[in-house]
Curated annotation (Swiss-Prot):
Pathway: Cofactor biosynthesis; methanofuran biosynthesis; Cofactor biosynthesis; coenzyme A biosynthesis. Keywords: Decarboxylase, Lyase, Pyridoxal phosphate. Its cofactor is pyridoxal 5'-phosphate. The lineage of its organism: Archaea, Methanobacteriati, Methanobacteriota, Stenosarchaea group, Methanomicrobia. Catalyzes the decarboxylation of L-tyrosine to produce tyramine for methanofuran biosynthesis. Can also catalyze the decarboxylation of L-aspartate to produce beta-alanine for coenzyme A (CoA) biosynthesis. InterPro entries: GrpII_AminoAcid_Decarb (IPR050477), MfnA (IPR020931), PyrdxlP-dep_de-COase (IPR002129), PyrdxlP-dep_Trfase (IPR015424), PyrdxlP-dep_Trfase_major (IPR015421), PyrdxlP-dep_Trfase_small (IPR015422). It holds the Pfam family Pyridoxal_deC. It catalyses: L-tyrosine + H(+) = tyramine + CO2; L-aspartate + H(+) = beta-alanine + CO2. One of its GO terms (molecular function) is pyridoxal phosphate binding. This is Probable L-tyrosine/L-aspartate decarboxylase. HAMAP family: MfnA_decarbox. Gene3D superfamilies: Aspartate Aminotransferase, domain 1 (3.90.1150.10), Type I PLP-dependent aspartate aminotransferase-like (Major domain) (3.40.640.10). SUPFAM superfamilies: PLP-dependent transferases.
Amino acid sequence: MEENGKTKEEILLFLKKAKSADASYERVLSSMCTYPHEIAVLAHTQFIESNMGDPGLFPGTFNLEKQVLAMFGKMLHHKNSPEKAGYLTTGGTESNIQAIRSMHNFRHDISRPNIVMPESAHFSFDKVANLSGIEIRKASLDKLLKVDLDSVRSLIDKNTIGLVGIAGTTEFGQLDPINELSKIAIEKGIFLHIDAAFGGFVIPFMDIDYTYDFRLEGVTSMTIDPHKMALSTIPSGGLLFKEPEYFECLEIHTPYLSVNKQYSLTGTRSGAGVASTYAVMKHLGRKGYKKVVSDCMSVTKKLVDGAEKLGINTVIDPVLNIVALDVPEADLVRKKLLDEYGWHVSITRNPRALRIVIMPHIKNETIELFLKDLAKVIK
């Protein structure tokens, strides 16, 4: 830091140059984030200074959070005061960490606990293991890349405190058999956390026969991310427990704040994300989100149909707006797409394929351009 400060104009010019080096979402096909909705940005700016880590100072923002949790609860069929059973987090990673922390605290009688989850689970659970020392056991996947239930059962023992199921896997967008995982959790008397960070704002607005939420008796907690398909600003995540007592397992005494209890992982917590999520959910409503999801699925179909004309199949039939294209030498294709045409795509691990996420910023015209460039790369 220099002795003398810069002018406002100098700073803004520097920031403009820095921003110009960032990728533009128009050619980003790999991210689960997107441009936030205009009303979300306005709300975020209006509440920029609010700190949910000290809610006694910001009762208006705290009330907005309760209303958001109530909307989450209705969407996820929660039955027991959702506004008292969760909070808005920084995103899926924090939500997953806190869900497992709650399991651990609730079952403090087990000295060497383990948790069973799919191989497809998000890397945030590896952070859980690193932070807590809890053993993470990963069940294999079936041919459709859903978690294999026999594998899950084989990994459960007397020290297993919980299971994890994924409603919209990060790599393939696949849906685990949550109904069957719920039955196993009930049978074994253990927790079941559902990571619906991506699918949580997609599945409720699709016409599919799939139950993954609090309608299932065995589901004890859920992750849902508004800053993905809900078009909220970053950071905006959500964590909801079936019962307030599971949420209360996260309680920490805070003697020098305006309230004497805190449940979040972070101390300081953005109220701007709360306001942003409230604003966009209220503005779009169910009909608005149905259109967002319908549009994304329509573009997804256009991508799949266009790829087939190039002789490229998908690894699995897309369930959500995530597509894995089975191309030879996927890593090389990815590199050429970026270096020669500026497209940002990612690679799935097993099998290795081109991973494309059709977020709301991706339009039909975008896919047409991408397919033309993909055809040049693979010829």
